Amino acid sequence: MPFYENRSVRTYYEETGSGFPLLVLPGGGLSGTLASLATPFNPMERLKDDFRCIAADRRNAPSGQSTGPLESGRPWDSFADDHLGLMDHLGIQRFGVIGFCISGPMILNLIKNAPERVVAAAMMQPSGYRPELPDLFYQNNMKEWGPALCEARADVTMEMVDAFLTSMYTDRTGFVFSVDRDFVRSCPAPLLIAPDDVPSHPYKMAMEVADLAPDSEVTIYPWKDTPEHIDEVVEHARRFLKAHVPVNA
């Protein structure tokens, strides 16, 4: 089982396929692991014929194998560190990204941290702020992720979880938590957005990102309602990501 280690962070990852590198970020919120990629579709299976697909368990997902400190002062950047560090470990300089749910905000922050490295990104059912449920992510994670992490890790307390979630969500309300609207207006990477509309995946916020970004595409909506629609979105993602592979790759 492959692990990448960087100081106190240990990341479990897998890769499959061949071609231009594609970083695959699971949904499942802070509990996201490789197993979370099973639905609505698994890029590790569906895109492996066109890309070298690389995915990892999220740091501190209770059921996963990736561990590290809770960096409450820089929650989103700590995940970007993990993603970029893994690419460095594998000797990959430039890559595409596809991700689900919480990975939408993570992708935008990844582009902010390494604009020269991300050639294109597909944000599937991205999460974002919903004004009628302003504390949704804090409350859900205090109820589920936090206690499960504390049970798995004797060095983590609910006070630490509270500080992390407050910094990650409560102090960053109003948009997508990880970046502001000005960044999206100048986002250097092409974006593909597949909107959803459940409490944690607000349609309005996904479409605002698409409207603000200077180079964006939007898939059909709804798309998770039938296998045929899922297939259509998978093919859209494949075309989009392939279209932005550098010619000298």
Q: Residues of each region from the PLM?
A:
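Catalytic active-site module of serine/aspartate enzymes centered on a nucleophile-bearing elbow/loop
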Residues: 216-249
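Conserved hydrolase catalytic core segment
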Residues: 93-129
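Hydrophobic, aromatic-rich cap/lid helix
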Residues: 154-180, 187
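Conserved HGGG/HGGXW glycine-rich cap/lid loop of the alpha/beta-hydrolase fold
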Residues: 7-66
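Conserved alpha/beta-hydrolase "acid-adjacent" motif
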Residues: 199-205
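Short beta-strand/loop motif that positions the catalytic acidic residue
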Residues: 187, 193-195
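Short beta-to-alpha linker loops that shape the active-site pocket of alpha/beta-hydrolase fold enzymes
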Residues: 57-61, 127, 222-224
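Active-site loop/oxyanion-hole signature of alpha/beta-hydrolase fold enzymes
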Residues: 42-45, 55-95
